[in-house]
Amino acid sequence: MLNNTQFGEIPNRRGDAMKKVLVIDDNPTIVELIKYAVNLQGRYDVVVAYDGVEGLERIYVEQPDCVIIDVKMPRMDGYQLARCLRGDPRTLNVPLIILSAMTREQDQMTGYLSGVDEYLTKPFKPSALNAAIERVILLTPADRQRRIEQLAQGHAGRE
């Protein structure tokens, strides 16, 4: 018997037909651009939060298959949010992508060391964002832990 993953479909965490992506960004214009880009694939239900605290609340309610996070937001920044999610066993393995205008290598390292799976910069290409979503949804917990350890070792070696 064939299963959906043989045809490139990735099962979601809840068993629904559509995978759910939570976008957390305080800029409504950017949120609309991200929603448009993600909806180009037609495979995702997109839900939104406009700051880190609201985003944290929505994660527990919505149980998304992937979370896209901005860094600079009111009430809780993206790095704090990522650390909070990685510190909670209920959200430890939720795929996280930072999408930020902060482009320095140090910003990216802070993101990865906070536990995000992918760090993309604005402006972004819809194809790159969609590829990142597909990639992080496929990561296993062991893949995620191995990547964080490698990044931490590489970062420590440069200090």
What function would you assign to each model-found segment?
Residues 13, 138-159:
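CheY-like receiver
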